[in-house]
Each structure stands twice: as structure tokens, then as C-alpha cells.
């Protein structure tokens, strides 16, 4: 894996220093980002709200140009602000609150995307909309996906599927690949991990299957939380039931986001949890492979 971080939230996409009104706080009121971030002081509140509702303006946390992480090839991954889940292992807790994003015009983001078309073509890459939760801003996501497809660029979304109802068929027609994060295979574990219900994710995956949308299943392996063989087998059975699934990624838990939780004054409940052993990771992948799933 190689990555070139371009959208550092400290400069090009300034992450507000404190939550509040959308895009307010820190340097966000004083500086525009290289994606055309809009200083809130320069935009009447009603215009900001109208822009959000129409999808002309989105709340963006950051972006990066990265290879072999969020889909095939080199990709421009844009992290939208706001998420309804509260995953215990989230390594970007600063994306949970939509108010911590910077207002960015869809047209400005598309202009940035267009600049990388030659890289995308050369590497078989494209764009990935992530978060946060991309489907918390469906109007903005819809505009970006439609614009990218008009440019001939491969598109992907990274989503929990919890807000799958926000994605209409027209939006999904502009999505080439869905990275579907299935946090657990049983309701009790899923609620413990995310604070939300599992069923919306399962329903969204089945809808993707009906539409024939290529899907990669992502599963985070956390010792003592999601590593129980029974719950892993349920995730594997679910993935195997979807003909649209072309790949499964078992992602070992890490504590890279722990400092962010502390900075935000949030309780990080996995402070004493170690990453899974290589043996546990491999045995978990074997469960998926035993069902004929291409697994990494």
C-alpha cells in the first residue's frame, strides 16, 4: 500500500476546531480550502442550508489520494462529515459530527476530481466517497457520483449501509463498487459495536444484490468483541448469500484513532484491546474462504 495524503484537515480542508453550527469553528471561518471551502462568514445561513438540501454544498472532513486501500487502483477518497453509528473502534471519531466538516461546493470537488483522471486511468482507480457515513449526505453524494460518471471515472462508496434507504436507485446506478462494512453478524454484537441495529445493513446488501452492484464486504476483527466464531460465521454466511460480493476484506483492529478519542473528550472503551494475532486473522479469513469467498 502507498498513500499520498493531500487533503490534510489542518490546511487544505480545514477541520473546525470545535463543533457548532455547520462548518463553524477553528480556521474554517477564516480560510477557504483548496477544494473551494466556503468561509461561513461569507455565506448567509439560509444559503448554506439551501445548498446542503440541494446537494450543491457538502460537509467535508478531508480527502486523500491513496493506493490499494479504498477500492482498486489509485483513488481520491473524500471523507464526508457526519455518521449515525458510534463504532467502538472508529479510527476517525472526528468525522462523526457533521458540524465538524468544512462546507465544500460539489462543483469545486468535481473540479479537483477531474484533475486526477489521468492517474485514475493509468492505475484503474477512481473516487471513493467515505466518511463518516456517505449516505448521511445523499444529495451531495448523488451530485458527486453523477459528475464523476460523466467524467468517465470509476466510483465507489464506503458505507455501513445503515442509511441505505437514503440511496435511491438513480444514485446507485452511478456507483460502480460498494465497500459494505458489516460490523458483526448478530444483533447483540452489532448493537454493542455501533449502538445501532443490524437489519438495515443486511437489507441494503440484499438490495445491492438485486441491483447487481459489485460489492466488497469489510469486516473489522476485534479480539474480545467481533472475533467469536459464531458471529464471524454469520457474517461469512451472509456474504456468501450475495452473488454481488466479489471480495471480502478482514481488517485487523488497531488503535490508530485512540488519540483522537482523547482529544475529543470521548471514552475509548478499547484502550486495553490488543490487535489480533496473525493466527487469529488467518483463521478468520479461512472461515470466509471456506464459503468460496475471495478473502484478504
Language model features by range: what are they?
Residues 55, 62-104:
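Canonical Radical SAM [4Fe-4S] cluster-binding loop centered on the CxxxCxxC motif
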Residues 103, 195-198, 275-278:
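Short, conserved loop/turn and helix-capping segments at secondary-structure boundaries
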